[in-house]
Amino acid sequence: MSVMSWRYSALADRHRALGSNLEDWSGMGTTWTYEATSLAQGYEAIRTKAGLMDVSGLKKIHITGPHANALINSTTTRDVRKIYPGKSAYACMLDKRGKFVDDCILYRMGPNSWMVVHGSGAGQEMLQAEAVGRNVSMQFDDDLHDLSLQGPLAVDYLAKHVPGIRDLKYFHHMQTTLFGAPVMISRTGYTGERGYEIFCKYEDAPKVWDTILGEGKSMGIIPCAFTVLDWLRVESYLLFFPYDNSEMYPFENEAPGDTLWELGLDFTVSPGKVGFRGAEEHYRLKGKERFKIFGLLIDGTTAPDGGSDITHNGRKVGVVTCAMHSHLTNRTMAIARLSVDTAVQGTPLKISGKNVETTAIAHTITFDDPKKAKRNAVG
């Protein structure tokens, strides 16, 4: 059903015309589904051709000033000295307990200028709190829209309009023009494919959207709903706060809060980095995992609902957070929160949910392209 949101996409009318009621995500009406294209069609397009998504519900925050680097360095897990202008990095934010509160992409725009893009967690509030007493300017930018063109043909389409796009490396961005509009194109995404995020002004978003879909139709480029990302992220081990977290699946006797060791996100901490919020607790909690994010390879073709129980030898050992069945690979897969002792390749498991009871094995993730060859492809 349609809901009221306090943020508004310039493409809302386009989405409604495609049969979306627009569900609220992070304060913006977002395309959970389209009548015009199914989730299976969107998934197949992005894996085999290309799909275009409106992901403008992501929050964009500009941070500038003499203390901008220090603010980013103290708030996130990345060493900002290694991120030069034109480069970006995936990072996490922790609370003082060393527990995950949000993830983000850090875009370095200049020597003392950044753009932080995050989802529905408390990233903005953390940055605001850490900015107190620092010589920085913070601006929340909802005029800036984010159109994500993802899939193996995305680069072929953009190459017709953007000189040098084939040379843009993974986690790098460029300022350019597209259809006469000023844009920033970033080689990032949330699909496991080679893809690009196109940041443009509110007033230019409809033209960019319409032109890509109009010109790209002959290449198989179609509009894709936001929830297609759930199908893609399961295969590509991409977590989505709070849907894989203890905020959604609480501990019995503890407040919500997962460690990076439990989530498998400890790689986001730059080697040897200290001094960021929650750092001491983060390092202290290594080896004290209460669960592990792990994959499931599931028997049958029915994807269990999120929240389905997982048992091993009659003992509950976890919960499914997100599952999908791929008609391209004929595999049914899931992301799960598993007990540490069962988060081992090949452990036999049973799944009991409202929509299915079946068996599975614990399986390492990533399922699709574990070496990230597609994301790092050149040319």
Predicted regions and their residues:
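Acidic, proline/glycine-enriched N-terminal capping motif
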Residues: 1-91, 99
